[in-house]
């Protein structure tokens, strides 16, 4: 009998420690801190609009990163030059032919050389470059920060905040989703 009583008290104390996870539609749910607690319906609507805009910004940042990744990869592939010996300068022809792959290059010594741009088709990783990897990391930092802010908004379990984040994600994807590549390694 004593065993039943102790197991019952342990059970009731552990169940009272759990938090019920239900959505609420309270208009005074704090967002990010107690200082940001809507006090009226208008303030609540403004907070929801802010979350929609923040979710749109998140999708725009992801699309911007995908666009920059494409640009950085294309720049990497076109970075190689081969000097063409015995060729005359073709600067005049280059100006009139938009499809020309031959260009003039002025070297560090001030000598004009004719070069041919060779596109690399290899799938090896791009070498580390400060001019590429620092902006990439900064963009990723922004994406991560905004994503965590959106996650914290959803974790308030407020229906309005949750729907606002979903609406912003939908509108952002609708606007810029075509620029986002899901497989980052398939360039």
Swiss-Prot record:
User: Which InterPro entries did the record assign?
Assistant: Cop_transporter
Q: What is this protein called?
A: High-affinity copper transporter ctrA2
When this gene is knocked out, what is seen? Exhibits a reduced copper content and leads to cell decolorization due to lower laccase activity, when ctrC is also deleted.
Q: How does it sit in the membrane?
A: Multi-pass membrane protein
Naming one, the record's GO cellular component terms include: plasma membrane
Q: What induces it?
A: Expression is up-regulated by copper deficiency and decreased dramatically when the copper concentration increases. Expression is up-regulated by the deletion of ctrC.
Residue ranges crossing the lipid bilayer per the database entry: 44-64, 137-157
The species this protein was found in: Aspergillus fumigatus (strain ATCC MYA-4609 / CBS 101355 / FGSC A1100 / Af293) (Neosartorya fumigata)
Which keywords does the record carry? Cell membrane, Copper, Copper transport, Ion transport, Membrane, Transmembrane, Transmembrane helix, Transport
Q: Which GO terms describe its molecular function?
A: copper ion transmembrane transporter activity
Pfam families in the record, alphabetically?
Ctr
Q: Give the record's family classification.
A: Belongs to the copper transporter (Ctr) (TC 1.A.56) family. SLC31A subfamily.
> What does this chain do?
High-affinity copper transporter of plasma membrane that mediates copper uptake under low copper conditions. The mechanism driving the transmembrane transport of copper has still to be determined. Acts as a potential virulence factor.
């Amino acid at each position: 009998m004593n065993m039943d009583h102790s197991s019952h008290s342990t059970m009731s104390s552990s169940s009272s420690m759990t938090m019920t996870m239900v959505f609420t539609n309270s208009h005074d749910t704090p967002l990010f801190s107690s200082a940001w607690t809507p006090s009226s319906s208008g303030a609540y609507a403004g907070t929801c609009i802010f979350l929609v805009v923040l979710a749109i910004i998140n999708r725009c940042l992801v699309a911007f990163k995908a666009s920059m990744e494409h640009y950085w990869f294309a720049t990497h592939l076109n970075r190689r030059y081969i000097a063409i010996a015995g060729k005359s300068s073709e600067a005049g022809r280059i100006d009139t032919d938009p499809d020309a792959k031959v260009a003039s290059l002025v070297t560090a010594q001030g000598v004009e050389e004719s070069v041919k741009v060779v596109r690399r088709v290899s799938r090896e990783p791009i070498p580390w470059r400060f001019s590429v990897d620092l902006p990439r990391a900064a963009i990723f930092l922004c994406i991560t920060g905004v994503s965590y802010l959106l996650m914290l908004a959803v974790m308030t379990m407020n229906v309005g905040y949750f729907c606002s984040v979903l609406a912003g994600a939908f509108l952002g994807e609708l606007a810029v989703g075509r620029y986002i590549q899901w497989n980052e390694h398939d360039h």
